[in-house]
């Protein structure tokens, strides 16, 4: 009998390396607004609290809320087209998930990434893995 019955994983930065697609999308927004861009390492420190927070932390200090919201709208349009371009599983993750399935340990994903993105990325990269639940950010 297994000591563990189930494991819940985060998506970004845990199962998938998504930093390049996210960073490229935010930098494209910043270029449109004539703001300085950031490198991938900078974005690693800005991620974790959702896209609005990411934009708030990426625009220069003192940027007004209206500009941030316009930037967020543009980011979503850009990221819709880019979110699968450079994203990939971390080395060994697919094998780990496969072994957990073989052991009968239930696997779930809980992410603050939008639910549609979360499900599409799981289907793309882990189509042979059985997940009990996949949850991304949802309205309400």
Segments from the language model and where they lie:
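N-terminal helical cap/lid subdomain that shapes the substrate entry/recognition surface
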Residues: 2-91, 103, 116-119
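Core-facing hydrophobic residues within beta-strands of well-ordered domains
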Residues: 4, 97, 129-132
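Short linear capping/connector segments at secondary-structure termini
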Residues: 40, 92-94, 133-137
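A broad, structure-centric signal for solvent-exposed, well-ordered loop/edge residues
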Residues: 54, 96-97
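Substrate-recognition "cap/lid" segment bordering the active-site pocket of phosphatases
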Residues: 86-88, 114-140
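Nucleotide and nucleotide-moiety/phosphate-recognizing core
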Residues: 93, 100, 127
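Residues at the starts of beta-strands that form the adenosine-phosphate
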Residues: 106
């Amino acid at each position: 009998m297994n000591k563990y019955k189930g494991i819940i994983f985060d998506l970004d930065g845990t199962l998938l390396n998504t930093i390049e697609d996210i960073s490229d999308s935010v930098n494209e927004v910043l270029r449109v607004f004539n703001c300085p861009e950031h490198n991938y390492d900078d974005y690693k420190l800005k991620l974790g609290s959702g896209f609005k927070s990411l934009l708030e932390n990426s625009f220069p200090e003192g940027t007004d809320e209206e500009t941030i919201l316009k930037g967020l709208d543009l980011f979503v349009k850009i990221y819709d087209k880019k979110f699968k371009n450079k994203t990939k599983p971390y080395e060994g993750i697919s094998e780990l998930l496969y072994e957990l399935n073989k052991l009968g340990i239930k696997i779930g994903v809980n992410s603050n990434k939008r639910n549609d993105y979360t499900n599409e990325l799981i289907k793309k990269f882990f189509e042979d893995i059985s997940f009990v639940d996949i949850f991304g950010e949802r309205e309400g």
